[in-house]
Amino acid sequence: HTVRQRSLIKSILKNIKYCEVEVITSKKILLLKETFKNKIKYHHKHNLIETIKKKDGSIDKIKTKKMFHHWLKSKKKWIIDMCKKYPNPDLIISDSVPQAFELAKKTNTKSINISHFTWNWFYKKHCKNTKSKDKVLYELDKSYNLADNFLILPLTPAEIIKKYKKKHKKINFVISDFDKVKKTKKKINCLIMDNGTKTLSVFIKKTIPYLKYIKNVNFFVGIKSYNQKIKKKLIKSKNIFPVNGLKKIHHTIPLADFVIARAGFNTITETLILKKPAIFFNEVDNEETSFNIKMLRKLKIISIIN
């Protein structure tokens, strides 16, 4: 999500003079401030909705369902608080935060959703109560129906496109600006991405001691979630190079000859645009990453390894 937010904000600042941008988020707010400094404003507030993962990176369905019920109980206060702070915004753009469109309705503001999936679609795949009317799904649908426009990215599920066919416009991939890099031909560069959800953390930790024996390959590995023992092994190795921070990991993609990562939308986008060969890992019980892989397979640009 941060990749799209950065690109969108850069475009707004570049093309619209005298525009004041304020971002409402929590976990990734420091990444945005690292990029934009004081060019925009920041409001640190959790948007209530996210997936909950187990230690192995797979989705915890029980806790994720509890999260949705917490969203249902908390969204009214969130909207009231935001109405008090932002009584007259000119435009609300959301990367699929459903209650943002209720805020737009309350403040009589135009709204745009930009994403490749919606939380009502995700909820139906993972948590829907099939035995009775589902209040959470009803409220999610109601929130999204209030959005004025949907900008639909590639790889979006057909159900979402059909559901919002009167409001949507298809757009291309949204990616970061990458610096031009000069690559050495002496060794192959392999980027191993431990993404924000830490899906591959366990796998990478087990693999690191053996990478030093593959001497014709330089490995670039994210280090944020690793202990000092692992970090020391990285420091001592002559062919393993630590990359600290999600932003720097993504900006290492142009340098890579090969990428190993979770099948997340942003990583797929960047490897496709930059034409980088990759191995993508699915997440257990995650309909989003599973769907991404299904779409790539449908386009006949990947093979499946079981």
Write out the residue ranges for each language-model feature.
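Donor-nucleotide binding loops and adjacent catalytic segments primarily
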Residues: I9-K10, S176-L255
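An aromatic- and histidine-rich active-site surface loop
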Residues: I29-L31, I92-T107
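Conserved nucleotide-sugar donor-binding subdomain of glycosyltransferases
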Residues: G57-L91, P98-Q99
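Short amphipathic alpha-helix
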Residues: T2-L13
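A donor-sugar binding/catalytic signature common to diverse glycosyltransferases
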Residues: L91-S96, N113-I114, K248-F291
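A nucleotide-sugar donor-handling region in carbohydrate enzymes
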Residues: F122-K198, K224-Y226
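Active-site proximal beta-strand in glycosyltransferases
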Residues: K105-F122
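Conserved nucleotide-sugar phosphate-binding/catalytic loop shared by glycosyltransferases and other
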Residues: K14-L72
